[in-house]
Regions:
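N-terminal juxtadomain amphipathic helix
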Residues: 2-94, 256
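Short, glycine-/aromatic-enriched active-site segment of Class I SAM-dependent methyltransferases
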Residues: 38-41, 211-234, 238-242
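Extended interfacial segments that mediate partner engagement and assembly in macromolecular machines
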Residues: 51-151, 163, 229, 234, ...
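Hydrophobic, well-ordered beta-alpha structural blocks that scaffold small-molecule cofactor pockets
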Residues: 105-106, 130, 267-404
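Conserved SAM-binding strand-loop segment of SAM-dependent methyltransferases
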Residues: 155-168
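A conserved beta-strand element that flanks and buttresses the S-adenosyl-L-methionine
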Residues: 179
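A short glycine-rich, Lys/Arg-flanked "PGG" loop and its adjoining helix->strand segment in the class I
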Residues: 191-208
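Conserved beta-strand signature within the Rossmann-like core of class I S-adenosyl-L-methionine
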Residues: 205-214, 403
Length: 404
C-alpha cells in the first residue's frame, strides 16, 4: 500500500509540473497566496460559518512555452459546486446589456435560428435563455448550480437543464452551437477539458464553438489582485487561449476583447485553419513581460490599498465595498480586511443577509446604505461606477466613490 501511495504521489507531482494546456515542463512560479477561501460565490448563512470557511493554497506559474497561467497547488476536491453557488451577475443593468448583446451577436453571426444549443457551465440559465429566445432555439444547459425555480415557466418547453458537471456522458448531445462562458477558468486540466469539447464537436462537425472568459493581460498589467482567487485556477490571454484551441484541433474563427477589455470571446470550429495568429493575440514574450510587471508591482499595490483603508479607519470613516462576488472576496482576503469594512453591498437579492467567505462581512442591499450613510464606497469593478453612482444619487447619498 505504501509503495502504491508513493507511486501515485510521484505521478501527481510530475503532472503538477507539466503545463495543463500544452504539457510542456516550462512552468515558472511567480506569485503565491496562502490560506485563501476555496469558493468565492457560495452562499454563507452565518458569520461564524464565513470565518471558518475552507481554505486552500494558491501558487501561480507561467508557462514560458504557451503563455498559460495555472495554480499548481489547486485541489479540486476542496470545492463543491451546487445550488448554494450564486454567480449571477444579471441583476446589474450594465452586465445584462452586455450579455444580451453578445447573445444577439452570436445568434445572428452564426445563423442560430431554430437550432440546438448546448451550454457548458450554464449557471442559472440566463444566457442560454437569451439565445433560445432570440433565435427560437432549443437549449440544453449543464451546470451543478442550476436552480429549477429560477427558470420561468414560458421557457421550459424549449430548454432542458442537467444539474451536473460536464463530462464524457455529454459529448454526444446534438448541438449546432457549443457555448461555454466563464467556466474554463474554473477548470484545472484545461487540455483534458478541451479534448471533451473536441469529442463533442466531432459528434457535431458543423457546430460552432463559442467561449467567453476573463483576460489575464489586464489582470497582470493593472496588478488586479482582486481578480485572482482559488476558483480561478486557470488564466488565459487571447494568445494562450487561441493556442489551446488550435492545439485541440479547432480553427479559430475570431477572438476579441470585450467589456472594457476584461473578457475574451473566441469563436471556433472543428478543423485545422491557419496557424497565423490573429491581430489580438499577443506573443508569449509579451505576456512574460506582463508577468514580470505584476511581480514587481504587487507589493506596492497591496501597500497602497492598505494605507488607504488605514487612513479611512483612522478618520473614523464608514467604508463599504460594492460587489459581494469573487472580486470582493479576493479584495478583502488579500488585504486581510475584517473590522475595517463591516458590509459588502450587492444588487443580487439572493445574496442579501449572507456573509463574505473567510472575512465575514454581512452582504446588504443597496437600500441599506440610506441609514448606514457610508463615507467611502469601493466598487469592485470600475465598469459599474456610473451605475453605482446613479444608485447612490437616487438615495441622496454622496460618499466618495472609488473603483478598483
Amino acid at each position: 500500500m505504501h509503495t502504491r501511495a508513493t507511486s501515485t504521489a510521484a505521478v501527481a507531482a510530475e503532472a503538477a509540473r507539466a503545463c495543463p494546456s500544452c504539457r510542456s515542463r516550462r512552468l515558472e512560479a511567480f506569485h503565491e497566496h496562502r490560506g485563501i477561501p476555496v469558493h468565492s460565490c457560495r452562499l454563507v448563512s452565518t458569520a461564524d460559518e464565513a470565518l471558518a470557511f475552507p481554505r486552500g493554497e494558491l501558487s501561480l506559474s507561467f508557462c514560458a512555452n504557451c503563455g498559460f497561467i495555472t495554480n499548481t497547488e489547486y485541489d479540486g476536491s476542496l470545492q463543491d459546486y451546487s445550488v448554494a453557488y450564486e454567480e449571477t451577475q444579471g441583476f446589474s443593468a450594465r452586465f445584462r446589456q452586455f450579455s444580451e448583446e453578445l447573445a444577439a451577436r452570436w445568434v445572428e453571426e452564426f445563423g442560430l435560428h431554430g437550432k440546438r444549443i448546448v451550454e457548458i457551465g450554464a449557471g442559472k440559465g440566463e444566457f442560454l435563455t437569451a439565445m433560445c429566445e432570440l433565435g427560437d432555439n432549443f437549449g440544453v444547459g449543464i451546470d451543478p448550480s442550476f436552480v429549477e425555480e429560477r427558470l420561468a415557466d414560458e421557457h421550459r418547453s424549449r430548454m432542458q437543464f442537467l444539474r451536473e458537471l460536464y463530462g464524457e456522458q455529454h459529448v454526444g448531445l446534438p448541438a449546432d452551437a457549443i457555448v461555454c462562458r466563464h467556466t474554463l477558468e474554473h477548470i484545472h486540466d484545461v487540455g483534458g477539458f478541451m479534448r471533451l469539447v473536441r469529442q463533442a464537436a466531432e459528434n457535431n462537425p458543423t457546430a460552432v464553438v463559442l467561449f467567453e472568459l476573463p483576460d489575464v493581460v489586464r489582470v497582470l498589467r493593472d496588478v488586479a489582485f482582486w481578480d485572482i482567487y482559488y476558483e480561478h485556477c486557470s488564466y488565459f490571454s487571447t494568445g494562450s487561449l487561441a493556442r489551446l484551441f488550435r492545439d485541440s484541433g479547432f480553427e479559430v474563427l475570431g477572438a476579441r476583447l470585450e467589456y472594457d477589455d476584461q473578457y475574451i470571446t473566441l469563436e471556433a470550429r472543428l478543423g485545422q485553419g491557419s496557424d497565423t495568429p490573429l491581430a489580438v493575440e499577443e506573443p508569449v514574450g509579451a505576456l512574460a513581460d506582463d508577468v514580470a510587471l505584476f511581480r514587481q508591482s504587487y507589493a506596492e499595490t497591496i501597500e497602497r490599498w492598505r494605507d488607504q483603508l488605514a487612513e479611512a479607519a483612522a478618520a473614523g470613516e464608514r467604508v463599504v465595498i460594492w460587489g459581494a462576488g469573487s472580486k470582493g472576496v479576493s479584495f478583502l482576503t488579500t488585504l486581510g480586511v475584517t473590522v475595517e469594512i463591516a458590509f459588502a453591498v450587492d444588487v443580487n437579492p439572493y445574496k442579501h443577509g449572507k456573509y463574505m467567505p473567510a472575512t465575514g462581512q454581512r452582504i446588504v442591499a443597496p437600500e441599506f446604505l440610506r441609514e448606514y450613510k457610508p463615507d467611502l464606497v469601493i466598487a469592485m469593478n470600475s465598469i459599474y461606477l456610473d451605475e453605482i453612482g446613479a444608485q447612490l444619487e437616487s438615495m441622496d447619498l454622496q460618499p466618495r466613490l472609488l473603483g478598483v
